[in-house]
Amino acid sequence: MKKHGVLNSEIAAVLASLGHTDTIVIADCGLPIPDGVKRIDLAVEIGKPSFLDVLQVVADDMAIEKVTLAEEVINNNAEVNKEIELKLIEPAFEYVCHEQFKEHTKKAKAIIRTGEATPYANVILHAGVIF
C-alpha cells in the first residue's frame, strides 16, 4: 500500500504520466467536462471533497510551471483566488475569460471533479519539470 502522496490510483497514474507542459484540471462540481477528456469524479456530496483540499494534495505531488484560472474568480470568488495564490507560490499565473478557460480544458490529460460548489473554483495546472 502506498504511504505518501496521492492515494487515488487514477490521479496518481495521470500525474505519473504527465510530461512538460501537459495539463490537468481541478474543477468544481459544475464545470462542463468535454467529451474525450478523462473524468476523475471525486464528488460525493456538495462541498466534499473541497476544491482547495484536492488542489493541495495534487500540488504537493506535482511539478507545476504555470496555473490558469478564469479571470471571473477575482471578483466572484476572491477567497478561493487568494487561497490558490497562497498555496501555489512558485508557478506563473495566467487569467483568461471563463469561455477561454473552458476551451483550454479540452486539451487536458484529465479533469478532477470535486464537490466544490462555489463560483469559478477551477484551475488548470501546467506540468513543469523537476530538474
Swiss-Prot record:
Statement: the UniProt record of this protein carries the keyword Acyltransferase: no
Any one biological process term the GO annotation gives: D-ribose catabolic process
Enzyme Commission number(s) of this protein: 5.4.99.62
One CC-aspect GO term: cytosol
Keywords, sorted A to Z: Carbohydrate metabolism, Cytoplasm, Isomerase
Residues holding substrate: D28, H98, Y120, A121, N122
Subcellular location: Cytoplasm
Catalytic activities: beta-D-ribopyranose = beta-D-ribofuranose
Enzyme class: isomerase
Pathway listed: Carbohydrate metabolism; D-ribose degradation; D-ribose 5-phosphate from beta-D-ribopyranose: step 1/2
Secretion signal span: none
Pfam family of the protein (one): RbsD_FucU
Subunit composition and interactions: Homodecamer.
Function field: Catalyzes the interconversion of beta-pyran and beta-furan forms of D-ribose.
Family statement: Belongs to the RbsD / FucU family. RbsD subfamily.
UniProt protein name: D-ribose pyranase
Source organism per UniProt: Bacillus anthracis
